[in-house]
């Protein structure tokens, strides 16, 4: 496209959430509280998983990276939004805008891949519990996690390198509170066809592709849970994946509503965007902390004066996820001797000896 006599702009102007100073002050306090809560929740979860050997399992390795991604995603969006709520001049350079777009792509793409990897982990734990330790070996879950980061960075690099070549002329007002690629493309006066193709591929591969992987995993999981005859068995099996299922629903639900809305700056579009970029990172760690029994158990243990001791002699361990006084088809009960633990030892270490225990 010929640029003619258009002057090239070097900064963008954000309209933000509101022009009313009183509303902006109220929103500043609200979003600052949410941001601080997000940081504290995710840091606490990270430190807990790191410090406690009982939580050194594939699921918690995924969860630690998910918490770190949520922490980064929130830190990319919220600080600049808080600055704009207090500032009269809501501008940012083109380079700064593209830097924010890059890290949004990295964190959002990595989170989508991590959620699909966690879905596969839950699929292996529920559908093939006897082989879980062999399926989710250290090499596999390390590859899944670091592969998620690699795909996130690759996706961001491709999209931003194409955006660097775009020229922005005259129109520089963004009807939003943050900088995202769909908001920038209409402002360009150069050819954006390649950027549109790259954005479409990113949406299909990272968004739709990972969603299909999660959907297929949970189709098998639900089928397996429904095949369990006892109500308590079904309840225990479902509880192992309820936190992840809630996080997936929140992520894809809010993301779908956000990206289906036009970038017009309408109140309803801004509400869905705030839900996706500000509220969801805060809720993820809260969901896992409240729904996961081991995380709640570790918090309780830290408040106790001592850890409970195992009874001496031969203890018998029954896999808790499916059986309760009866045998389920395809999931036979196994009784496994547990080695007595010394006082003060982690009670979870005894459970690692049981390969049939649901992770």
Curated annotation (Swiss-Prot):
The chain crosses the membrane at residues 26-46, 55-75, 100-120, 140-160, 198-217, 238-258, 270-290. Residues 47-54, 121-139, 218-237, 291-359 are cytoplasmic. Keywords: Cell membrane, Disulfide bond, G-protein coupled receptor, Glycoprotein, Membrane, Olfaction, Receptor, Sensory transduction, Transducer, Transmembrane, Transmembrane helix. It is found in: Cell membrane. Disulfide bonds join 97-189. Glycans are attached at residue 5. This is Olfactory receptor 8S1.
